[in-house]
Amino acid sequence: GGISVPGPMGPSGPRGLPGPPGAPGPQGFQGPPGEPGEPGASGPMGPRGPPGPPGKNGDDGEAGKPGRPGERGPPGPQGARGLPGTAGLPGMKGHRGFSGLDGAKGDAGPAGPKGRPGASGPAGARGNDGATGAAGPPGPTGPAGPPGFPGAVGAKGEAGPQGARGSEGPQGVRGEPGPPGPAGAAGPAGNPGADGQPGAKGANGAPGIAGAPGFPGARGPSGPQGPSGPPGPKGNSGEPGAPGNKGDTGAKGEPGPTGIQGPPGPAGEEGKRGARGEPGPTGLPGPPGERGGPGSRGFPGADGVAGPKERGSPGPAGPKGSPGEAGRPGEAGLPGAKGLTGSPGSPGPDGKTGPPGPAGQDGRPGPPGPPGARGQAGVMGFPGPKGAAGEPGKAGERGVPGPPGAVGPAGKDGEAGAQGPPGPAGPAGERGEQGPAGPGFQGLPGPAGPPGGEQGVPGDLGAPGPSGARGERGFPGERGVQGPPGPAGPRGSNGAPGSQGAPGLQGMPGERGAAGLPGPKGDRGDAGPKGADGAPGKDGVRGLTGPIGPPGPAGAPGDKGESGPSGPAGPTGARGAPGDRGEPGPPGPAGFAGPPGADGQPGAKGEPGDAGAKGDAGPPGPAGPTGPPGPIGNVGAPGPKGARGSAGPPGATGFPGAAGRVGPPGPSGNAGPPGPPGPVGKEGGETGPAGRPGEVGPPGGSPGADGPAGAPGTPGPQGISGQRGVVGLPGQRGERGFPGLPGPSGEPGKQGPSGSSGERGPPGPMGPPGLAGPPGESGREGAPGAEGSPGRDGSPGPKGDRGETGPGPPGAPGAPGAPGPVGPAGKNGDRGETGPAGPAGPAGPAGARGPAGPQGPRRGFSGLQGPAGPPGSPGEQGPSGASGPAGPRGPPGSAGSPGKDGLNGLPGPIGPPGPRTGDAGPVGPPGPPGPPGPPGPP
């Protein structure tokens, strides 16, 4: 065999026609959860939701334990001076005083002349008794002297010392506390406390797994309302907020009436002996003593010598007489001056805590306080799982295409994200049937006709037409006149309840307002989500039972009683007329991307669209196998950039190449700028046969929440103050009664107002793709969604022509050749080496901003994921067209078969703590009268 020398490269053949679209690739694996994104900025505060249903009254708390004795209060003010006491009883007889000392002996007088003894004189009178003194010891007996002259009356003796004061009696024991006095009047209500500190902000939870975004499906007609699902699990309780500041102390209440005096206490122990009292006043003189009897006659004396008549000295003192009898007790003296106030005694031991008194009556509500300040906006909660797609609605009329808008600025190429590992393959959904195409232009809405007949069986599915050759890009048409808005579609079925949002920060608790008159009963709204259970209240202290007053004026309706058992479902009400279209709401937060939908039927071939904007640069593919080394040529000088040649004739179909290795899925690029509006599509097909009527749906959902509260009424007149009644014994708590019988079914209610957004349910079944409507105006720019999972690998495109080496002259535009026969689909060729990135094109001029489009729906409907088309050649960066007017809604597509239930989303993070006290609920109807209480004690 000879050596094969490579010959020169032949000319490039004509470019082949694009092959038919390849079969849909296998379901892509779901990637692992991405890195948690940066927390978004807090969005604007949404409108205040309707008031929730009033909570049930909690059961009475257990009686609180008796409190500890309070601290000793400051000493009270000095009491008023007491009245003079009654005259005391006469004192006890004093003890006998001690014997007085003997008196001093007097000086002897001068001796008198001795007289002759005269006749015996009469006996002298007996002197007065001296002061009563104790008998002294007898003195020595002197010699008997001659009888002296009668002595003079002795001077009055001094009063003896007063007896010592008796010891004070023991202090009495502290008496038992008397019964509690009546409760004093309630003091005025204290000022409201200051605002509490806002609770700590809850941590942002990690976003859920991002699914691949589906294409929006057409909205179908509203189906019957499904039964309400079971209530969801109870959410975790929020963390308690920081404690609030202590409120100002209320004004001091008026003192209560004086309590009844308690019984006297038992006798106390004997006290210590008191100090000696001061001497009392001098007593009155006693009565004169009895006169003594005559003395014995003396002996005659001897005759004395007459001397000078001098007075003789007195004789020696005679013996002291015996003490006289004790005198009568003196009269009671005047009451002495009031002594100084004694210091307060030490506090006695605390008495035992008495049993708790009966509960007091509730006080009258105070005047309404000023409205509380609005709390801070709560942290925006994470978007809940994607809701189920609604059934397709009726399509509106097709508008006339508008003129092209101004050229917008060219978008920058986004950076390629990190490549994630492939996830497990998800289950493929069931494929729905494709209905026939709808009619052409829709007329103005006519009057509502009678209910139609039975729905016909859907027609057979037509075979898809052959794929036509791709036409050249046409010039954008002129912007047509905006068509009239289409008729409002029927109200869609109620979505599944959405996930509970994060509770807002704690607001200032408002004061309790005055009870208003009941407002008119509002229409019955949809049932709102069940609120979180409130924190258990603190055990209150049971107060004293107040007096029973006369019946006052009719009060405001009481709180709503506990809900009884659900009655039997009533008949389905007549469907109300569709309500007026509401104002467009603010754009909602971007929801999580849903899971990839099931592969749908291939749709009908659409009109050739304009070339899209240049996509982002794809990730570099894996290196292909190294080819044989070619001959080394001379390096030529770079030639000038040639003009873009026109498309050449299609070349012959080449042999299918060898199957290449499937590379790993590349990361999703950033979304490019919107392309110009496409041309108006063809009119739809003929109207399909009417379908058969559906089965009767399940009974409607649970009754909605009460309507809004009525306007506050004027306060009623002040009731007459009642007399104080006898304190009754607290009655025993009655047992809970049996639930009442269910009431009769009511008439169908009026169409209620739109309910608040429910919790977002699991993704519903995917409907078939509807007809493509004209492009609408650009809505507001939404928040960037989560990064989608890697898309499926598209079918490989036809092998491109091999370019000539070296710079060639610009070729003349050739005539378009006839389309060649469609060759068989080629096998995947080896992936070529990644070429260098081209230079970035110049940025286009900034286009004028188009008119603001109408507010889009809060949530788009997840469409079916179509089969991946062959990759087209990258087009040049086209100018961004202006947003076209919103086209009318197209005719409704046929209902698709129900899809499989989606997977439940991950639980959201625990939100920040909610307010401790919620807004006051609407005033409920008056409850039934309670049973009479037990009679009080007589």
Swiss-Prot record:
Pro residues bias located where? 137-149, 619-631, 762-772, 807-822, 923-938
Spell out the molecular function terms from Gene Ontology.
extracellular matrix structural constituent conferring tensile strength
Q: Which residues are reported to carry the modification 3-hydroxyproline?
A: P664, P912, P925, P928, P931
Entry keywords, A to Z: Extinct organism protein, Extracellular matrix, Glycoprotein, Hydroxylation, Phosphoprotein, Secreted
A GO biological-process term: extracellular matrix organization
Expressed, tissue-wise, as follows:
Expressed in bones.
Q: List the carbohydrate attachment sites.
A: K93
Q: Where in the cell is it found?
A: Secreted; Secreted, Extracellular space; Secreted, Extracellular space, Extracellular matrix
Regarding how it is modified after translation, the entry says: Contains mostly 4-hydroxyproline. Proline residues at the third position of the tripeptide repeating unit (G-X-Y) are hydroxylated in some or all of the chains. Contains 3-hydroxyproline at a few sites. This modification occurs on the first proline residue in the sequence motif Gly-Pro-Hyp, where Hyp is 4-hydroxyproline.
Q: Per its UniProt record, what InterPro entries does this chain match?
A: Collagen, Collagen_superfamily
Q: Where is the composition biased (Low complexity)?
A: 26-45, 107-135, 183-222, 338-364, 373-392, 563-577, 590-617, 646-662, 843-867, 874-907
For the modification 4-hydroxyproline, the affected residues are: 18, 21, 24, 33, 36, 39, 54, 69, 75, 84, 90, 117, 138, 147, 150, 177, 180, 192, 198, 207, 213, 216, 231, 240, 243, 255, 264, 279, 285, 294, 300, 314, 323, 329, 335, 344, 347, 356, 365, 371, 383, 392, 401, 404, 422, 439, 445, 451, 458, 464, 476, 485, 497, 503, 509, 518, 536, 551, 557, 578, 584, 587, 596, 602, 620, 629, 638, 650, 656, 665, 674, 677, 693, 703, 712, 730, 739, 742, 748, 763, 769, 775, 784, 790, 810, 813, 816, 871, 874, 892, 907, 913, 926, 929, 932, 935, 938
What the protein does?
Type I collagen is a member of group I collagen (fibrillar forming collagen).
Q: What is the name of this protein? A: Collagen alpha-1(I) chain
Q: Which organism is it from?
A: Megalonyx jeffersonii (Jefferson's ground sloth)
